[in-house]
Amino acid sequence: MSFKNSFTWGGATAANQYEGGYDEGGKGLNAVDVLTNGSATEPRKVTWKKPNGETGATPLVWGKEFKLPEGAIPAIVDGYYYPSHQGTDFYHHYKEDIKLMAEMGFDIFRLSMNWSRILPNGDDKLPNEEGLAFYDKVFDECGKYGIEPLVTLSHYETPLSLITRFGGWKDRHLIDAFVHYSDIVMNHYKGKVRYWLTFNEINAMDMAPYMGGGLIDGSEENRARGAHNQFVASAKVVKLAHQIDPNNRVGQMLAYSAFYPYTCDPKDQLKVMKAKQEMLFFSDVQTGGRYPDYRLKQYERDGIELNDKAEDYDLIAKYPADFLSFSCYTSNVLTTHGADAKASGNVTAGGVKNPYLKSNAWGWATDPDVLRIALNDLWDRYHKPLWVVENGLGSADTLEKDGSVHDDYRINYLRSQIKSMCDAVTIDGVDLMGYTTWSAIDLVSNGTGEMKKRYGFVYVDRDDRGHGSLKRYPKDSFYWYKKVIASNGDDLD
């Protein structure tokens, strides 16, 4: 047996890309509800209004500072298309979708709760009962099929009211608001949910500060404060979760990429080292329990003030994450030299193409060894249980006239990734809890806002402008993954 009997198999989704029902059931707006569609070459945009009535849209550029014009606040503006408003309509299709997951044999279903569906303004004293009831129905449906939920509390869904009133996570008010929200849902769903993640890809605070922290001014200091406030909030939620139910386990979620030097020049290796430090800073704090010296020296050099409190660091040290989960799709090649071909894509921008690997239409290299590298790196550094909670292939699938979708390219990608995981476990001794692919069912691409960049095992009839029946069609990969799960990863043919 390649994986232990308790190994969990499933798929992952996010409310802002999948759920829909953006103005139903008492839900308030969140950060992504004002984010337009885009493409591989056209960035998504945050739409805004000013008090004088002026409107506009600011491109969301990954890996760079983001700032709205002075006086602008995020808002829905006529004439723009917002793909998150409907997603692929899990809100009305949850029974059908969970049944499809059960047919594949899912042990686990990773989903996020829409914070503003529970607390429309993010910090309301009392919860929205319709929102609580919706997730009750979802978790009950999961329970009916023996599927365990893995719930992300915040997957880029910062309530818009907290952004417009406080400027997002740079303000310490959001610590208390998030803990209040977590307290409500952890008490309400006690016995239905025991696995929780606090913040999706917490290092998005650096890579995409509007998405990761609801920051409308993504300056270095605001990003540093936003990260610190999320670390403190996470520690408080770990403490709270254990008090509410000793069976609760709260994990970190990190966006991981392997970094390779383009040459053997030591300066290329130093560039790789710095890139890894920028990424692993977030897990050094949230999972490791302490601020690393390299980041403290950076803040000192740059004159960054965190607006912190002395007790913050005691909390961070005492209540680190119980386990470390992560997303991993690809690897990056870095150099201080010129190169013939630059890499493209929102997660590989700034690097160069790897001559040993093929890339997909969105510029992401297909790396068959990246998960083994990631798992060993994180296990050796932290020695805490690991969980791969996002890993998949985005592609423009074709729905045939007979309703079939032949996605051998996805099967080939996932086969290589599972083999890589297996080597990390059986050869290297990594403690791996489970695997949830991205994604269970087609949804809106976070990076580009497209539908044509599909990840799921189930095709959803919806296009880039929101047209389509929303009918579900299992792909070839659906039946392949069912076989993989049934064999606990032994049958990958």
Question: What residue ranges belong to the model's regions?
Answer:
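Aromatic-lined carbohydrate-binding/catalytic grooves of carbohydrate-active enzymes
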Residues: 104-132, 151
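Active-site mouth loops of central-metabolism enzymes
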Residues: 79-93, 170-172
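Active-site region of glycoside hydrolase catalytic domains
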Residues: 1-78, 121-123, 132-493
